[in-house]
Amino acid sequence: AYYNTVNKNNEKTQIFLNAYLQAEVIKGLKYKLNLGLRKDHTKSRTYTGTYDLGTYGKNDAPDLSEGSSDYESWVLENTLNYDKEFGKHNLAAMVGYSAQKDKSYGLNGSNADIPEFIETMTGNVKSMTASSSLNELALVSLFGRIMYSYDDRYLVSASIRRDGSSRFKKGHQFGSFPSVSIGWNISREKFFKPLENVFDQFKLRFSYGKLGNQQMDKYYPTISVVSDGMNYLQGNNIWFGQLPNVTAVSPADLTWESTETFNAGLDLSLLNGKLTLTADAYVKNTNDVLLPIPYAASTGISGLSIQNAGQVRNKGFELSVNWRSTIGDDFSYYIGANATTEKNEVTKITAGGNNMAISGYSAHGAGGRGINRFEEGHPMSYFNLIETDGIFRTQEEIDNYKNKDGKQIQPGAQPGDVRYKDWNGDGVIDENDQHDVGNPFPDFTFGLRLGGEWKGFDFGLFFDGMTGNKIYNYQRYCLESGKFNGNYSTKLANSWRPDNQNTDIPRFSKTDGADNGLAYTDRWLENGSYFRLKTLDIGYSLPKNLLKKIKLENVRIYTSMENLFTLSKYSGYSPDLGESGSVDIGASYSVFSRGIDQGRYPIPRTISFGIQVSL
């Protein structure tokens, strides 16, 4: 009913321009200029009519909000590339410079209680509001790379880039990010000849690289913001004031987040290319992690301050195996599989002291407590929740639920209420019982490819999945906790009652002594493992002898299907959440968004048909 009173209109115009110029300066030396331009214009308008929806809300007079925004950006890149072969030696080098600038401007206005049937910004001027915004961002880079190989046997490459960002203050704007790699193609060595009938390639790889990250919501995180409206009444006079630093400001020494990666790899090809294998082991150390951190409540400052919060280590192993062969003269096929396992851990906290734990996403109704945390010795963004242990079936169970000192743990509970685990053993269920109950990162991710071709027919399948990850189902919390006015899940019809005790849903009551609808418990945490048929392609290519008559090279008729099925215990729309900027923690930081399902748009199932023609 509410949405029937709302009329929303959005218009967006985008213009893109990409161009390049390339010239050979001297033999082997090429200059290239790349230019990219983009311009966006957006208009939005929302008109909300009158409504009376009882406890949900009431609007006695229409409201109107209008806005427009403009965004423009340009990217300029200059590069010089040099390639030279002399005998068994091959040398390639590149140097370049790039610059980028983004600028956005927004204007918004709104008015409440406007006259009905007059959809313009008129009416009560006291309720009118207007605001504007202007943001600019600049990034400059110098970079270079050199690669050398001898007889395709020994390979060496090195690169470095120097990036500068306007997000940081002077003295901290620039970061240097080098990398180096070496490779040894052992199968090219003379001593490997006895095995050359088995191995087509046997190569070892080692590399080190450093990458920088300056992505954050705020354009000017270290600059103080002056807030007006700091007014007070003294006698018959109103004093109008402004105050700096009312919102959170980052430290002046805020700088680049950097990730150092150490990698060792192996590439194998056997049996005339039928079997290939690639394996990589790696360690990634991320330093000066950019995270949003709240000020102490005593400061009176709201919002989150972006800080270089700590260090994170990722250790993992990746394996990819592929087999390609034929059966008879007409049927060819391939099978491929890949798998990754990784361990994630916060190794150091550098913001607020080594013992500090940084709270992340706070669900509505969580009382400001974080659902996930960034804490030393744990995976980043692990779920910090109170464990549940089923439902009390009888009063006797409640009376006997005591700690080691004989203290009754949930004295206010009734049969049908949730049993919470007293993790610290003090006989009280509170924030001290929150602890690590899982994290959003999978223990194991995998993929499987199958395909083949027979007399013009071809097919291909791709499966993917992951295991071991957890998802906080915020949608289910909203629909089943009883904390909200509005629609409830039909599952609540199966709530515990004296005549319906074989259920895992607690009794339904707006007031209860156990607080069955707590947000910061693992009642809303689910297994995010899944197995999915991601793509299925089927095609048929017309015979060549037929195509010659109509002077065509190739004609293929096909159907392509995506997301045909997903096997998962997760009750939401899709367990494949990835990362999102939609999680409301005051800033869009993917580290705290992963594994939080706030109503992510479900992945669509698509089936398409087509024809490919080559002349």
Language-model features and meaning:
Residues Y2-K8, L21-E24, I398-R419, L492, ...:
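Residues embedded in well-ordered regular secondary structure
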Residues A1-T48, K58-E375, Y520-L615:
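Extracellular/periplasmic, surface-exposed regions of secreted and cell-surface proteins
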Residues S165, M466-R556, S560-E562:
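Extracytoplasmic gating/loop element in the C-terminal half of outer-membrane beta-barrel translocons
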Residues F462-D464:
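Transmembrane alpha-helix/helix-exit interface in multi-pass inner-membrane proteins
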Residues Q307-P442, M466-N469, N473-Q475:
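Gram-negative outer-membrane beta-barrel transporters
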